[in-house]
Amino acid sequence: MLTEQQRRELDWEKTDGLMPAIVQHAVSGEVLTLGYMNPQALDKTIESGHVTFFSRTKQRLWTKGETSGHVLNVVSIAPDCDNDTLLVLANPVGPTCHKGTSSCFGDASHQWLFLYQLEQLLAERKTADPASSYTAKLYASGTKRIAQKVGEEGVETALAATVNDRFELTNEASDLMYHLLVLLQDQDLNLTTVIDDLRKRHQ
């Protein structure tokens, strides 16, 4: 969250009391929406943990999802270098847009978002009926079988590379990535965990 010093340095005069607040998905990086905060909206956002804007049409504080339940749970808030714009990282509960989409900016999402969405789907299949899908059946087969599939797909990916078959390499790499994500979910891990570890190694 913002430090006390950061809050004091916010330039409300420059923005006429309404500061743009960009809300970004804390995990996928997708830009979810843009709203405006006055000091009271920022205070409520920090106190409640839910993104709250000042509605210019209703002329009052408005917590995103206050009627639908599709709130935005705040992870962090940071000012930009000029102290006149806020970046809010949040985890959404349900779709952010009133049109039912994850972002108010439609399909203008980063390709990496698909991996996050795939992870969510795989997590749901973890407790599904084994007869309902290949993924659910794979979970039911147990960790050893899932790990075996990762090993098999890893070997097939390497073999495709050794013969310079780019088409087959792409297919096998996709299979490997899928089974690796299943294995991570099986062990209650995810890509974020792996990314955090890679980031630590890079430092």
Curated annotation (Swiss-Prot):
Ranges for region Phosphoribosyl-AMP cyclohydrolase: 1-114
UniProt xrefs under Gene3D superfamilies: MazG-like, Phosphoribosyl-AMP cyclohydrolase
Coiled coil: none
Region spans: Phosphoribosyl-ATP pyrophosphohydrolase: 115-203
Entry keyword annotation includes Hydrolase: yes
Reaction it catalyzes: 1-(5-phospho-beta-D-ribosyl)-ATP + H2O = 1-(5-phospho-beta-D-ribosyl)-5'-AMP + diphosphate + H(+); 1-(5-phospho-beta-D-ribosyl)-5'-AMP + H2O = 1-(5-phospho-beta-D-ribosyl)-5-[(5-phospho-beta-D-ribosylamino)methylideneamino]imidazole-4-carboxamide
GO molecular function, one term: ATP binding
Keyword Cytoplasm on entry: yes
GO cellular component terms attached to this protein's record: cytoplasm
EC number: 3.5.4.19, 3.6.1.31
Keywords: Amino-acid biosynthesis, ATP-binding, Cytoplasm, Histidine biosynthesis, Hydrolase, Multifunctional enzyme, Nucleotide-binding
Gene Ontology terms: biological process: L-histidine biosynthetic process
Pathway(s) served: Amino-acid biosynthesis; L-histidine biosynthesis; L-histidine from 5-phospho-alpha-D-ribose 1-diphosphate: step 2/9; Amino-acid biosynthesis; L-histidine biosynthesis; L-histidine from 5-phospho-alpha-D-ribose 1-diphosphate: step 3/9
Subcellular location: Cytoplasm
Pfam families: PRA-CH, PRA-PH
Family named by the database record: In the N-terminal section; belongs to the PRA-CH family.
Protein name from the UniProt record: Histidine biosynthesis bifunctional protein HisIE
Species name: Salmonella typhi
